[in-house]
UniProtKB/Swiss-Prot annotation:
HAMAP family: MntP_pump. This is Putative manganese efflux pump MntP. The chain crosses the membrane at residues 3-23, 37-57, 65-85, 107-129, 144-164, 169-189. The keyword Transmembrane applies. Probably functions as a manganese efflux pump. One of its GO terms (cellular component) is plasma membrane. The keyword Cytoplasm does not apply. It is a multi-pass membrane protein. PANTHER family: MANGANESE EFFLUX PUMP MNTP-RELATED.
Length: 191
C-alpha cells in the first residue's frame, strides 16, 4: 500500500473522532490546549489499538478467504464509507440536549473514543488481506486521530457549525474510493 493511501486511511479513520471532538470543543466553556491534547491522546491510543485487533482477527481467517480477500476489503471499506456518509448527512440527534459538562471525564472520553474507533477495527480486518505493515498503519491512524481530536476540540466553537458533519462525509467518500481502488487493482492486476 502506498504512503498516500496509508495517510488517507489515517485521515479517514480520524474524521469521525474529529467530528465528535468538534462537538466536545463546542460544548466546553473555554477549551485549553492541555485538555484538548489529553482527549487527543485518549482517542489516538484507542484508535491505534482497534485496527490491530481487527488485523489479528482478519489474519486468523486469512487462509479461508484468500481467494476473495479483495472483495472483503472492498465491501468493508465501502460499507463503512457509506455508513459514514449516511451519518454525516443525517440530522443531529438528541444528544445535543444532554448536559455538556458530563462529557469530558476520562471514561466518557474513552467510551467516545472507542465508539468512534469501531470502524478502524473493521478496517483492520480488511488490512489483514493486504500487503501493509499493521504497526505503521496503526501508528498513522493513532497520530492522525491525536492531531485531529486535539485540533477539533480547540477549534470546536468556530468549526462546529461549519465543518462538523462534512468531516464525516469526506472520510466516508475517502473510504469508498480506497475500497474501489483496491478492488480495481486486484481485478486488473495493477500494483
Amino acid at each position: 500500500m502506498s504512503p498516500i493511501s496509508i495517510l488517507l486511511i489515517g485521515f479517514a479513520m480520524s474524521t469521525d473522532a474529529f467530528a465528535a471532538a468538534i462537538g466536545k470543543g463546542a460544548a466546553m466553556r473555554r477549551p485549553v490546549f492541555r485538555d484538548a491534547l489529553r482527549a487527543g491522546i485518549i482517542f489516538g491510543v484507542i484508535e491505534a489499538i482497534t485496527p490491530i485487533i481487527g488485523w489479528l482477527l482478519g489474519r486468523a481467517a486469512l487462509q479461508y478467504v484468500e481467494a476473495f480477500d479483495h472483495w472483503i476489503a472492498f465491501g468493508l471499506l465501502g460499507a463503512l464509507g457509506i455508513h459514514m456518509i449516511y451519518n454525516g448527512l443525517r440530522p443531529d440527534s438528541a444528544e445535543e440536549d444532554e448536559d455538556p459538562s458530563q462529557h469530558h471525564g476520562f471514561w466518557k472520553l474513552a467510551l467516545t473514543g472507542f465508539a468512534t474507533s469501531i470502524d478502524a477495527m473493521a478496517v483492520g480486518i480488511g488490512l489483514a488481506f493486504m500487503d501493509v505493515h499493521i504497526g505503521v498503519m496503526a501508528a498513522v491512524i493513532g497520530l492522525c486521530t491525536l492531531t485531529m481530536v486535539t485540533a477539533g476540540i480547540m477549534f470546536g466553537r468556530v468549526l462546529g457549525s461549519m465543518v462538523g458533519k462534512r468531516a464525516e462525509i469526506i472520510g466516508g467518500v475517502i473510504l469508498v474510493i480506497i475500497g474501489a481502488t483496491i478492488l480495481y487493482e486486484h481485478l486488473h492486476g495493477v500494483g
